[in-house]
Amino acid sequence: IIHNLFTPRMLPFLKKKINYDHIAWVTYTHPEIATFGVNQSQLRERKISYELFDYDFEHDDRAITSDSTYGRSKVYVGTKGKQKGKILGGTMIADAAGELIQELILAKKANLDIKHIFGKVYPYPTASRVNKYTIRPWFARKLNERTKRIFKWLY
């Protein structure tokens, strides 16, 4: 942004267009509200195919131990074409949501597939595991019924 304030007058050919799809913001209330990327209405307007993943912190182990179970995470993931499996945007309402959402912001900016977040090993219990839990249903669908029963029995 600073670049665009000074450069156009001096060197107009260096002017860069700002991509607002990568802008994030946090509202510092209690709890915090952190948002990044595109929202649901923008996705519909652009006719982008997506799936919404929603996770409530009520039963999250770290949220329970830190007495901050009031929280929710919503993440939009592309479902078709080059955006399939890519994080498109999201919102988190929680204590320290501005810090918890950083991993998702980086994944969006770097155009990482959600398997990179899901495949990451998080220390237990870590607050940022909510990012993995939010997108878990994407991968759970791919398991066959026998595997699901085994995991249900184990966990």
Task: Tell where the protein language model's regions lie, with residue ranges.
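Internal hydrophobic alpha-helix adjacent to the cofactor/substrate pocket in enzyme cavities
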Residues: I1-Y20, I48-S49, K108-I114
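Flexible, glycine-rich terminal cap/loop adjacent to redox cofactors
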Residues: Y28-N39, R44-Y155
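Short, glycine-/aromatic-enriched active-site segment of Class I SAM-dependent methyltransferases
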Residues: H22-A24
